[in-house]
């Protein structure tokens, strides 16, 4: 099972909650809930949600490399 860090990375890579959900085999709402939980955990809005997809906010751009590192470390431990 992929962590919320991995889910967030997939959303950023795909530029869309829907495409990330399809890739992961999750519902769009499950992906969205995981990203919201990560935003609550960090205390900042990480993504700008628009009709044409998502984009990292300024805070998201600052946090993204750290979130990627955490996800990569998790993968290495598996």
Model segments located where?
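Base-recognition residues in the alpha-helical recognition helix of bacterial helix-turn-helix
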Residues: 6, 18, 32-34, 48
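Residues within the DNA-recognition helix of helix-turn-helix
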Residues: 27, 34-37
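A short LG(V/I)-centered, amphipathic sequence patch enriched
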Residues: 39-56
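Hydrophobic two-helix hairpin corresponding to the core of helix-turn-helix DNA-binding domains
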Residues: 8, 20-21, 57-60
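Short helix-boundary/capping micro-motifs
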Residues: 10-25
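Alpha-helical residues within the helix-turn-helix
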Residues: 22, 33, 40
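The N-cap/first-turn positions of alpha helices
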Residues: 1-7, 28, 60
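Alpha-helical linker/hinge and terminal dimerization helices associated
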Residues: 41-42, 63-78
């Amino acid at each position: 099972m992929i962590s919320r860090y991995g889910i967030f990375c997939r959303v950023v890579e795909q530029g869309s909650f829907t495409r990330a959900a399809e890739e992961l085999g999750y519902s769009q709402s499950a992906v969205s809930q995981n990203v919201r939980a990560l935003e609550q955990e960090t205390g900042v809005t990480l993504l700008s949600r628009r009709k044409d997809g998502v984009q990292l906010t300024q805070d998201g751009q600052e946090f993204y490399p750290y979130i990627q590192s955490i996800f990569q470390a998790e993968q290495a431990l598996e």
